[in-house]
Amino acid sequence: MIVCTTENIAGYRIDKTFGEVFGLTTRSRNLVRTFGAGLKTLVGGEVVTWTQLQDQARLEAIERLKNNADKIGANAVTMMRFDSNEANGIMSVVAYGTAVKVSEL
């Protein structure tokens, strides 16, 4: 499955457009790690726990995006983007784009 952030894929032509497709994940933070991360904000620097959580969520959202595109017959996703939201220690990440069927030129 090809996933790109551009409208076109070099070396391929778009044969069919299926439309919007997305992958969503929602994760909660570990209370102990959140407390430790809160202490880290007092001294500055990267909050590794939160970075890892966001990275895992983005990877999971992309995998779900690919699975959803595959289910409708697409073999690529163009114009892929991320959106995220966090409230009360719960983080949602969505990967979305346009599901397409492509073939090599």
Swiss-Prot record:
Coiled coil: none annotated. It holds the Pfam family YbjQ_1. Gene3D superfamilies: Hypothetical protein apc22750. Chain B (3.30.110.70). SUPFAM superfamilies: YbjQ-like. PANTHER family: UPF0145 PROTEIN SCO3412, UPF0145 PROTEIN YBJQ. HAMAP family: UPF0145. Belongs to the UPF0145 family. This is UPF0145 protein OEOE_0637. It comes from Oenococcus oeni (strain ATCC BAA-331 / PSU-1).
